């Protein structure tokens, strides 16, 4: 079989048909990704300001989302408390650092339940205070009014539901 040049081995991609709605949706996806990264940067900056360098922003968000719940590692993902792929690693680190307590379930010894320690609650409170300050600033500036943030959240929940249905359909 003759060798192909790199240009021949990859079929040319034809442009997808796009309309204004598609373009707006794609822009929303880019904004959403940037917002997530900026949120992590804000958490990182807050912890640097407080002189706390032991946690990554992802770990701080895991602590924040865990809150007062006591769940298994699997439930962290299924309940939307953690979106990453390395939940076991981050939980292990948080246990080692003293932010999360873990214990085996009585009913199923393979399963581990996790909850925040007092030190973890303090981190959660730090992140909550940061987000409250941001919400107050956004409220005062009027950013949350047009369109109302509640309507924006409703729209994002609809997108979330659509995506979840797409994933269920695949499997």
Where in the sequence are the language-model features?
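Alpha-helical linker/hinge and terminal dimerization helices associated
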Residues: 35, 39-42, 46, 80, ...
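N-terminal leader segment of winged-helix/HTH proteins
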Residues: 1-53
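N-terminal positioning helix adjacent to the helix-turn-helix/winged-helix DNA-binding module
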Residues: 24, 57-58, 119
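N-terminal helix-turn-helix DNA-binding core of bacterial DNA-binding proteins
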Residues: 42-86
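Basic amphipathic alpha-helical segments that dock to polyanions
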Residues: 63, 76, 91-97
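Charged, amphipathic alpha-helical coiled-coil/dimerization segments
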Residues: 14, 92-151
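C-terminal regulatory/oligomerization modules of transcriptional regulators
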Residues: 1-22, 144-171
């Amino acid at each position: 079989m003759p060798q192909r040049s790199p240009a021949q081995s990859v079929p040319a991609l034809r442009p997808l048909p796009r309309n204004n709605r598609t373009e707006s949706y794609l822009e929303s996806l880019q904004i959403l990704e940037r917002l997530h990264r900026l949120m992590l940067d804000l958490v990182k900056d807050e912890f640097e300001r407080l002189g706390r360098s032991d946690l990554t922003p992802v770990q701080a968000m895991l602590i924040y989302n865990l809150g007062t719940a006591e769940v298994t590692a699997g439930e962290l993902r299924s309940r939307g408390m953690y979106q990453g792929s390395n939940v076991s690693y981050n939980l292990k680190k948080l246990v080692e650092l003293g932010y999360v307590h873990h214990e085996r379930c009585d009913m199923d010894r393979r399963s581990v339940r996790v909850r925040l320690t007092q030190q973890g609650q303090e981190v959660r409170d730090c992140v909550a205070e940061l987000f409250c300050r941001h919400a107050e600033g956004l409220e005062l500036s009027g950013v949350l009014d047009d369109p109302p943030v509640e309507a924006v959240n409703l729209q994002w929940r609809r997108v979330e539901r659509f995506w979840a249905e797409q994933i269920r359909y695949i499997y």
